[in-house]
Design a protein with these regions (language model features):
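N-terminal helix-turn-helix DNA-binding core of bacterial DNA-binding proteins
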Residues: 8-15, 20-58, 80, 84-92
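Short, hydrophobic-biased segments on the C-terminal half of alpha helices
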Residues: 66-67
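Long, low-complexity, charged/polar intrinsically disordered regions in eukaryotic proteins
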Residues: 1-8
Length: 103
C-alpha cells in the first residue's frame, strides 16, 4: 500500500501526463539537443520560447503547462533574465513508472 503522500504525488504525475500538449513537451525535453547557430538552449534544457515555437502554442499556454509539469516534479526550471529554461527530471518519470509496476 502506498503512503498517502506517495499517492498524492502519483496523482499529480497522472494529471500532468493526461494532456497531449504536456506529453509533447516532455518528448521535446527528452530529445533536447542544441540547434546549430542557436544559443538559447543547451544540450539538456529548453527555453520556453522554443517550446512555444515547436508546439505552436502561446507563451502563456506553455507557462500553464509547465506549471503543471513542475508541480508534478517532472521538470525543473531555471530563470535567466527574462527567459525560463526547462529540464526534464528523468528520475521522476522513472520513479512514477516503478510505482506503477508495484501496483
Amino acid at each position: 500500500v502506498m503512503a498517502p503522500r506517495e499517492t498524492v504525488r502519483l496523482d499529480e504525475v497522472f494529471k500532468a501526463l493526461a494532456s497531449d500538449h504536456r506529453r509533447n513537451i516532455l518528448d521535446i525535453l527528452s530529445e533536447s539537443t542544441p540547434e546549430p547557430g542557436k544559443t538559447c538552449c543547451s544540450a539538456n534544457e529548453v527555453c520556453g520560447c522554443k517550446l512555444s515555437d515547436r508546439l505552436g502554442l502561446a507563451p502563456s499556454t506553455i507557462s500553464h503547462h509547465m506549471s503543471v509539469l513542475r508541480a508534478a516534479g517532472l521538470v525543473e526550471a531555471r530563470e535567466d533574465g527574462r527567459w525560463t529554461y526547462y529540464t526534464l527530471r528523468r528520475e521522476a518519470l522513472d520513479e512514477a513508472a516503478e510505482r506503477l509496476r508495484r501496483l
